[in-house]
Structures are given as structure tokens and as C-alpha cells.
Amino acid sequence: MRFTSVRGVKINFKIVGSKGPWVSLNPGGRREYKEAEPLAEYVAAKGYRVMLHDRRNVGASDISLSAKETEEAVWADDLYELLSQNDALPAFVGGSSSGARMSMLFGLRHPEATRGLLLMRVTGGA
């Protein structure tokens, strides 16, 4: 496990691959980044660096319930900061279900940092 502080919250993350454009993969629901590891390994083998992380309130990352915005908006801004800290911008950002919704918000909130979106199983949510 590797941790960093992102906007006052300890975030667990992993980088897969050592060269190429950056990609962030985000599982759905409240699943840990481990769910996306097989896909990350495949993408990295094709010449990309992949950022995986446990979003706040998920997996090994800290719990923080004080946000005044939707959780997916908070996650999008956390991801922006995490990618910034690792000189990983601009990036392709993608995910499934809640990870897809968070990715779309990332693109809307940080268009200059978004190379493209990879959206899988785009579903509803509260």
C-alpha cells in the first residue's frame, strides 16, 4: 500500500506501469481499486501508466463525511489533486458505474486535465 494526503484525507493508491500516457481507472460502487488491477495490468502492458486509488470513504483510504458537495464531485476533485501530485496530468479518466459518473464530473470540472473519458457500465445513482 502507498498513501498520500489529498485535500486533508489519506488516500491509498497504486501506479501500474512506468511509461506512457496516464490513465486513471475507477471501479464502481464502493469497491477498492483492487477490482481494477487486472484491467490496469493489461492497459499498462500496452504502454500506459495507470493510476489506481481507493477513493475517500472506500477501502484503505480515510473516511471523511464533512463534504458539502456530492461524493462523486469530491472524488473528482480528489483525483485531480492525486494526479497533480504525481505529475500525471493530463490523463485519460475512466471507470464503471459510480467510477464512470465520477469520471464525467472530472472531465466537466477539470477539462484542461482530461485527455479523454473511458466510460463503462454507466448507471444511475442517488
Stretches with model-predicted labels:
Residues M1-K10:
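N-terminal cap/lid segment of alpha/beta-hydrolase-fold proteins
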Residues V9-D62:
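Conserved HGGG/HGGXW glycine-rich cap/lid loop of the alpha/beta-hydrolase fold
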Residues E37, Y80, M104:
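Active-site phosphate/pyrophosphate- and oxyanion-stabilizing loops and adjacent acidic/basic residues
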Residues L39-V43, A67-T70, P111:
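Glycine-rich, phosphate-binding/catalytic loops in enzymes
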Residues L52-G94:
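Active-site loop/oxyanion-hole signature of alpha/beta-hydrolase fold enzymes
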Residues L89-G125:
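Conserved hydrolase catalytic core segment
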